[in-house]
Structures are given as structure tokens and as C-alpha cells.
Amino acid sequence: MQFTDEYSKKTDRLKSLIENADAIVIGAGAGLSTAAGFTYSGQRFHENFHDFEVKYNFHDMYSGGFYPYDTPEEFWAYWSRYILINRYYDPPKPVYNELFELVKDKNYFVITTNVDHCFQKAGFNKQRLFYTQGDYGLFQCSVPCHNKTYDNEE
């Protein structure tokens, strides 16, 4: 990939700042997962949710998450597949792995709205992550009378 001189200067400066930092706080949102290939519309949606697209006439995963399904079975059919591909499949591009390589030997902490588990899959320490919106891989009862969560992979 070829970059402009100005872009190269900025990335070199950023790399230098990271190398010389005592600590790093990373703030990340949906754009990072999108850059890693976790898109919620287009070809990825069509390949994984074509049956829902035809039956319910929505055209992206986000809309499907708010669709008023007639039955709990339809709701969970959608959400179980959604969680499978957005939590348990690896992202197509190594964006998170590359970010981890930049900070792995640093005192880092991550604050993220991403619920797709990509940080942990790339090697980030769970104790250094704060998921403000949770994790697709964990369930909690609908009347949270305790703080226990349940792994949903199986």
C-alpha cells in the first residue's frame, strides 16, 4: 500500500508516541470492527441473513435486531445467528492483531463499545478491557437479580 508523504509522517509520529508512552488508553467503537471487516450490511449481511432479508424485508443486521418478530423462536433464530457471526467468527482483517502488536508490551487499557470480543481474540488481556455495552458471548437473565452472566457459546 502506498501512502502520501503527509500520511507517512503522521503514522511515523504516532508510532513514536506509542513507543515512548508510559501508558496508553485506547478508546474504540464500531468503526474499528468495521475496518476489521465486520460490516453489518451488504455482502456479509446477504450471505448470512438472506432468508431473513427475504421473509422480513430488512437489509442490514442492525434493523434485524429491532424487528418485531411474531414469535420468540423467530427472535432467537435471528439473534443466535447474529451472535454466532459477530462474536464467534474471526474478523476477516487483522486490524485488532496489528493494534495489539503496537501496545502488547505497554501499560494499556481499552474502553470500548464493541461487543464482538475482537480485542480478546487478538490477545488483549481481559483485565485491561472495559466493555461499556457488554459482550455478545454473555447472557444474563432478563430480571437481573444477581450479577452472574452465562457463556452462550454452546
Model-derived segments and spans:
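Conserved catalytic core of sirtuin-type NAD+-dependent deacylases
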Residues: 1-154
